[in-house]
């Protein structure tokens, strides 16, 4: 039995990640494809993260970084098991978000990556570019929904993309929504059909 693919969607806040994930789930109906999003706010760490994001509690940046990381590690075994059972996972945010946001706040990217080292490695990361309209919509109730901060996050994403150790697919914000939806669907289908070998380990 071939394993499933780990496909991650990344991008700035309000770039359309959740929408595109849901499009995939609807356009490729299958009992071998599941959706997962981070942070998972139902767990102990997830509830702490939710309190932080909604400004109910404050923590120092190092604690915040570790909370997001721990939230992903809570699901590392689940992800590994699902992939080995032939289940493809469509994931809304992953370790790259954690590293980009931490680095945008001044943390060492190398140190932040070390916390995530060993997580299941994605077979494909789809990065959704944000146009000026989407970036300017990044004003909201949650703590990171700030235009200036989001621009810093974007620069950190670009650094990771340029490293070339992960298979990134950048989706331009210039595409019309129906074109973007079809393009992403085809990219995901190809990734599912071409995945080979054992599940890798991220940043090892």
Curated annotation (Swiss-Prot):
Binding site for ATP: 11-18
The keyword Nucleotide-binding belongs to this UniProt entry's keyword annotation: yes
Pathway participation: Pyrimidine metabolism; dTTP biosynthesis
GO biological process: dTDP biosynthetic process; dTTP biosynthetic process; dUDP biosynthetic process
Family matches, as Pfam families: Thymidylate_kin
Protein name per the record: Thymidylate kinase
Protein family (similarity comment): Belongs to the thymidylate kinase family.
Presence of the UniProt keyword Transferase in the record: yes
Gene3D superfamilies reported for this sequence: P-loop containing nucleotide triphosphate hydrolases
Alphabetic keyword roster: ATP-binding, Kinase, Nucleotide biosynthesis, Nucleotide-binding, Transferase
InterPro entries registered for this protein in UniProt: P-loop_NTPase, Thymidylate_kin-like_dom, Thymidylate_kin_CS, Thymidylate_kinase
Top enzyme class: transferase
Catalytic activity, EC: 2.7.4.9
GO molecular function: ATP binding; dTMP kinase activity; nucleoside diphosphate kinase activity
Catalysed reaction, written as an equation: dTMP + ATP = dTDP + ADP
């Amino acid at each position: 039995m071939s394993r499933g693919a780990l496909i991650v969607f990344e991008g700035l806040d309000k770039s359309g990640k959740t929408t595109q994930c849901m499009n995939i789930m609807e356009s490729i109906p299958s009992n071998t494809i599941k959706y997962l999003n981070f942070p998972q706010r139902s767990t102990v760490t997830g509830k702490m993260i939710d309190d932080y994001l909604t400004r109910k509690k404050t923590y120092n940046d190092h604690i915040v970084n570790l909370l997001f990381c721990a939230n992903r590690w809570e699901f590392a075994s689940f992800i590994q098991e699902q992939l080995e059972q032939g289940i493809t996972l469509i994931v809304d945010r992953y370790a790259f978000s954690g590293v980009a946001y931490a680095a945008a706040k001044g943390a060492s990217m190398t140190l932040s990556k070390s916390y995530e080292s060993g997580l299941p490695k994605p077979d494909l990361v789809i990065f959704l570019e944000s146009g000026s309209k989407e970036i300017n919509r990044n004003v909201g109730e949650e703590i990171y929904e700030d235009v200036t901060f989001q621009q810093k996050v974007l620069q950190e994403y670009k650094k990771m993309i340029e490293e070339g150790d992960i298979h990134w697919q950048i989706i331009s914000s210039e595409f019309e929504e129906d074109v973007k939806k079809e393009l992403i669907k085809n990219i995901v289908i190809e990734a599912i059909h071409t995945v080979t070998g054992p599940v890798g380990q991220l940043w090892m």
